[in-house]
Swiss-Prot record:
Catalyzes the thiamine diphosphate-dependent decarboxylation of 2-oxoglutarate and the subsequent addition of the resulting succinic semialdehyde-thiamine pyrophosphate anion to isochorismate to yield 2-succinyl-5-enolpyruvyl-6-hydroxy-3-cyclohexene-1-carboxylate (SEPHCHC). Belongs to the TPP enzyme family. MenD subfamily. Homodimer. SUPFAM superfamilies: DHS-like NAD/FAD-binding domain (SSF52467), Thiamin diphosphate-binding fold (THDP-binding) (SSF52518). This is 2-succinyl-5-enolpyruvyl-6-hydroxy-3-cyclohexene-1-carboxylate synthase. Binds 1 thiamine pyrophosphate per subunit. It catalyses: isochorismate + 2-oxoglutarate + H(+) = 5-enolpyruvoyl-6-hydroxy-2-succinyl-cyclohex-3-ene-1-carboxylate + CO2. The keyword Manganese applies. Keywords: Magnesium, Manganese, Menaquinone biosynthesis, Metal-binding, Thiamine pyrophosphate, Transferase. One of its GO terms (biological process) is menaquinone biosynthetic process. It comes from the Bacteria.
Length: 581
């Protein structure tokens, strides 16, 4: 076989083997060196290929797809800085335990360190953020096809392993590498007769669920039984099954539940949200849990962590399905590597406890909910707080909600509306490394993975940061409904001490952008609306949520008004809480 033939065969085997693992979504960025990989993916009948001129957007799209499905999408790119553009999403995927497969094309050995064009050191580029990386040899007849296939199998296994995450395969290609038609038996396929007949991967890696030791379960049960003031914290949970089990445990034991917005439990009306209560110093002064069971990943709000840090509980137990350390304040006493939902089920007692604790919190929570509903009523101004609350109450249960970092996720965490009978949508966000980049692309990937429309709540700076990802919206199978909260800058910095440094604040932190989001929508051919009241926002979003095409709703405000509104609303909530304590 000549070089073109063996290169074509290798790439076909790679794509075919990935498909046999159920991996069909390919995110391809155009390039010359990656031609054989692109051609193999495009010509495989089982693939679903999306083209991304921007590699950064491709990687964040793959991230969103993985969050929705638990499966990796495959990234294909050419050599040079192309692969480096994947880095931010690879970091997020690593910290969020989400699988991604990177196939980067590279130059042959003799071009390195010679000044050859578009040639950088790509092997190991992602460092400790990849679960595994390897540089394949150049395609060669001397290498058995089984070696190539089993390497692909291992890469898939590592990406889905414990914990899941990004895997990088760097593949050098020597010219000429343009694909050719192959016919007849190939020398190195002779031993693959069974593989060709059964449509199964050459080998699989069985994934086992993490089950806690019985002694650990019994010890945790004993601590729960003896605790006088226990608290359950639900951090980031991507599985609704896990969320339901943890919510059921809190309800059965009559234990207060701190449900983070990323837990899939925050909008459930069966539990009183603690985020608004922690705004009150009187409440935090009396809030002194002696046992904390923290299920899942990290949480958004700082106030709980501050309260716990000031009065550390005797026992602070973290249960998550990852061996990654979670102990930012160094007060965790026991970390258990287990499936959160399965572990929660093991803690459920035979008899339920009385609901006096939850009822007392529920009465206070109901008054807070009433106050926030009045704040969003007709005739009131449309603010960032009311936008988040109205949106949380209106989004269809069958849709997905992606919340961008900075102010949107904090507002949703604190002020989200409660919904009856667990009817909340799936909530997703990039909280692994909590960057503001790639949010539009991630939300687009989430929509395609879920197979449902997704609403994205995002600030103006994050929106502009990922503006080119609006190109994705034209060819999407599922629409993305974008709500942009535009306060002309980085609104979150107005809440920080640096805001008092008037000589440097506006230029260096406020960063007014003064760009037209309406013009951006027109440029990319996306429908646009800009409501100015709660009533018009509700009408605009109701129309958009029923639409089969993507659209943008812009909510305008100012950073000064936003700061004042947060202070005013939080003061009203504190007054309500303080009257009850």
């Amino acid at each position: 076989m000549n070089n073109k033939e063996i290169t074509t065969l290798w790439c076909r085997l790679i794509i075919e083997e990935l498909g046999r693992h159920g991996i069909h979504r390919f995110c391809i960025s155009p390039g010359s060196r990656s031609t054989p990989l692109t051609a193999a993916a495009a010509r495989n009948a089982g693939t679903r290929c999306t083209i991304f001129p921007d590699e950064r957007a491709a990687a964040f799209f793959a991230l969103g797809f993985a969050r929705a499905t638990g499966k990796p999408a495959v990234l294909i790119c050419t050599s040079g800085t192309a692969v480096a553009n994947y880095f931010p999403a690879v970091v997020e995927a690593s910290f969020s335990n989400l699988p991604i497969l990177v196939l980067s094309a590279d130059r042959p050995f003799e071009l390195f360190e010679t000044g050859a064009n578009q040639t950088i050191r790509q092997q190991g580029l992602f460092g400790t953020y990849s679960r595994w990386n390897i540089e394949l040899p150049e395609p060669s007849e001397a290498i058995p096809a089984e070696a190539l296939l089993s390497t692909i199998d291992y890469a898939v296994g590592r990406s889905l392993g414990s914990p899941p995450g990004p895997v990088h395969l760097n593949i050098p290609f020597r010219e000429p590498f343009d694909p050719v038609n192959l016919s007849g038996p190939k020398p190195r396929e002779a031993s693959l007769t069974l593989w060709k007949q059964n449509n199964e991967p050459l080998n699989r890696f069985a994934l086992s669920r993490k089950i806690a030791d019985r002694a650990v379960v019994d010890r945790t049960k004993a601590l729960l039984k003896n605790a006088s003031s226990p608290l359950i914290v639900a951090g980031q949970l991507d599985s609704r099954t896990d969320a339901e089990a943890i919510g059921s445990l809190a309800e059965t034991l009559d234990i207060p539940l701190y449900a983070d917005i990323s837990s899939q439990l925050r909008m459930n009306d069966t539990h009183a949200p603690l985020q608004p209560l922690l705004l009150s110093k009187r409440f935090t002064a009396s809030f002194n849990p002696d046992l904390i069971l923290h299920f899942g990943g990290k949480i958004v709000g700082k106030q709980l962590a501050i309260t716990i840090k000031n009065r550390a509980p005797e026992h602070f137990i973290v249960i998550n399905n990852s061996s990654r350390r979670y102990n930012p304040d160094h007060n965790v006493t026991l970390q258990i590597e287990a499936e959160p939902g399965e572990f929660a089920k093991l803690l459920v007692p035979e008899k339920s406890r009385s609901g006096k604790h939850e009822r007392s919190l529920k009465a206070l929570s109901d008054e807070i909910e009433k106050e926030l509903d009045n704040y969003c009523a007709s005739g009131k101004p449309l603010t960032e707080i009311s936008t988040a609350r109205i949106l949380s109450g209106m989004i269809p249960e069958s849709h997905g909600l992606f919340i961008a970092n900075s102010m949107p996720i904090r507002d949703m965490d604190t002020y989200a509306a409660l919904r009856k009978n667990g009817s909340a949508p799936l909530c997703a966000m990039n909280r692994g490394a909590s960057g503001i980049d790639g949010n539009i692309a991630t939300a687009a990937g989430l929509a395609q993975g879920l197979g449902t429309p997704v609403t994205l709540l995002i600030g103006d700076i994050s929106f502009l940061h990922d503006l080119n990802s609006l190109t994705l919206l034209q060819g999407m199978e599922q629409p993305l409904h974008i709500v942009v909260v535009n306060n002309n800058g980085g609104g979150i910095f107005s809440f920080l001490p640096v805001a008092t440094e008037k000589d440097i604040f506006e230029t260096n932190f406020g960063t007014p952008q003064n760009y037209s989001i309406r013009a951006a929508a027109e440029t990319f051919g996306i429908s646009y609306n800009s409501p100015s009241s709660p009533e018009s926002f509700k009408a605009s979003y109701a129309d958009l949520s029923r639409s089969a095409v993507s659209g943008i709703i812009e909510v305008n405000g100012s950073r000064e008004e936003n700061l004042a509104e947060h202070r005013r609303v939080n003061k009203q909530l504190r007054n309500i809480i303080d009257r009850h304590i």
